[in-house]
Design a protein with these regions (language model features):
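Active-site mouth of glycoside hydrolases
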Residues: 1-199, 210, 215-219
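Short, acidic/turn-prone active-site loops that include or flank metal/cofactor-
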Residues: 205-208
């Protein structure tokens, strides 16, 4: 009788972990207009034009969950693939070979930081589009990013505040969450979650949070 699901975002059109199968993912939030082809052989992304089919499907799935009494945590960004997939980074829409906008990073970790204003502006535009798509629905929560490492802390704090500030002007306001920052060498700390402006958090098991959590102080929801 579960009443909560995570609606995953997968950021790369093509990826592979180790010797595993090659995986493909679509649609994506941005239109593939070209000119020219991206590294996966399909038209390059225009990061200033949204793929309306992506957002229509997002809303349809949240509405379908609502009819079944299910709350949906919309994952805005996904950090695991860029960290760990042996193939993946080179196919990301923000890799300079895959878009027509001259957007790119000097290091992939930059995508989850505040270091590149052009990337941040496009990320914020995407977040606003998600909010506009589902704001009137009651069964919505937001998760900023799944399993980005500790390099993402200030970026996640910024995004939490950004979502809250925009929704404050909208008809409805929804809980915004921050989940544990996982990384092979760059994991975050539960302390960073508790210090965040998030409404809800998902800590790692340290301190008994897997099976014997301590009393909550009421500042944040710890599901």
């Amino acid at each position: 009788n579960h009443n909560f699901i995570r609606l995953w975002r997968w950021e790369v059109p093509r990826h592979r972990y180790g010797q595993g199968a090659l995986s493909f993912c679509e649609p994506h939030p941005w239109a593939r207009t070209g000119p020219g082809n991206a590294r996966d052989g399909k038209p390059k992304f225009d990061l200033t034009k949204f793929n309306e089919d992506y957002f229509k499907r997002l809303r349809q799935r949240v509405e379908a969950a609502a009819k079944r009494g299910i709350f949906v945590s919309i994952m805005l960004f996904e950090g695991h693939c860029l960290q760990f997939a042996d193939e993946g980074r080179e196919f990301h829409p923000f890799h300079p070979d895959n878009n027509i906008n001259g957007i790119g990073w000097t290091n992939w970790e930059e995508y989850y930081t505040l270091k590149n204003p052009k990337i941040l502006q496009l990320q914020e535009a995407y977040v606003l589009k998600v909010i506009d798509t589902v704001n009137d629905l009651d069964n919505v929560l937001y998760e900023i990013c799944n399993e980005a490492g500790n390099y993402s802390t200030e970026w996640q704090y910024h995004m939490i505040r950004f979502v809250k500030a925009y929704e404050a002007k909208k008809p409805k306001q929804h809980p915004v969450g921050m989940t544990f920052q996982y990384g092979a060498q760059r994991s975050g700390r539960n302390e960073d979650l508790f210090k965040s402006p998030a409404d809800w958090i998902s800590p790692n098991p340290e301190g008994g949070y897997r099976d014997d959590p301590p009393p909550n102080d009421g500042r944040q929801i710890v599901p």
